[in-house]
Amino acid sequence: LMLERGAFDGTHMAMMVHPAPQECDHFPTLAISQCDFHYHGRTAHASVTPHLGVNAADAITVAQVGLGLLRQHLNSDDQVHGIVTKGGEAANIIPGEASARYFYRSTDLHSLSVLEPKVKACFEAGAIATGAILDVQPLGPPYSEFIHDHDLIGKYRQNAESLGRVFSPPSTKVAGSTDMANVSL
């Protein structure tokens, strides 16, 4: 939000400090997109008039099955994870509304742009299979992978070590994402 509103305009250097269980001078991150997926179906009584319903929760089930099947075709660094945020009100009512929130991550913005349509296609399949209407709401802009300034990292580390800080070996695992990465572009 600060970046989008110009808070970093004219800034030549920005630094993020993040709590961690050990000292580290930088951490690699993944690019990320985040979306809410809403299905609009038609509520009906599950026993009396099920044929009149359009089950929005079933649409999420189809999407989740699709995502599960998609995983074997993803790059090893791609991640897709999420939750159902709304799935119905009662067992005897076919839910007319259902929602899920999903995050998908990849090594960089380009790889993320390849992953994103595959994820969205799984949710579109849920709509096609059930007749529900899909509404996709991005939760903000995609966040980039972090672009590190290794000269700045070296100076930070040298100064911190002169103050007695002891650093852990650098992590080779790329995990997590941050909006600060967009400042690093």
What would you call each of these model-derived segments?
Residues 61-185:
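Metal-dependent amide/peptide-bond hydrolase catalytic core
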